Amino acid sequence: MKLSLCNEVLRHLSFPRQCAFAAAVGYDALEIAPFTLGTDPRRLTPRRIAAVRGALAAEGLVCSSLHWLLVAPQGLSITSADASVRRTTVDLMCRLCDLAADLGAEVLVHGSPVQRQLPGGAAARQDAARQRAAACLATAADAAHAAGVTYCIEPLAMRETNFINTV
């Protein structure tokens, strides 16, 4: 069995120090939350990505996956009625598929409860939001396939989100 640590619990440390700590206490990998690498993961440079890979390798770790995908930048949503918000969100989702591949991860775990929340009100509004989310996830699935990674949706408790609580 291999153990992976969600790196946001150590986000107060530099990434190399996160790696050193994880290795020292027996972890084999980090599950990286992209927001911990920069305020806008779309702007990570090849040099920064190489530095992340290097920090992992220096401690004998790998990147097991990416998670908490849509924390940054602010305002992302797969259910929003605003097409520009969804375009920005889908662009990030697709870029994160490439980032996962660049870091050697095989999996992206879509939790991000706030960014998938269904609107209140009429059932028709909620159905439309579900359809918008399905379209966003389908585009991310295509990008994941092209990058050679798997894009997963994480069912979350109803206290966290009202959308996708079971699979």
Regions found by a protein language model. Name each.
Residues 1-4, 9, 62:
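Mobile, glycine- and charge-enriched loop segments
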Residues 5, 22, 30, 56, ...:
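Conserved, mostly hydrophobic/aromatic
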Residues 6-10, 33-37, 68-71, 113, ...:
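Active-site beta-loop-alpha junctions enriched in small/polar residues
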Residues 11-16:
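Short N-terminal binding/cap micro-motifs at the start of the first secondary-structure element
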Residues 17, 21-27, 34-41:
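Conserved N-terminal beta1-alpha1 strand-loop-helix module at the mouth
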Residues 17, 75-167:
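Active-site acidic/histidine proton-transfer and metal-coordination neighborhood
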Residues 19-25, 44-67, 97-104, 138-146:
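Acidic (Asp/Glu)-rich catalytic clusters
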Residues 33-57, 112-119:
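Glycine-rich, proline-tolerant flexible connector loops at the mouths of alpha/beta enzymes
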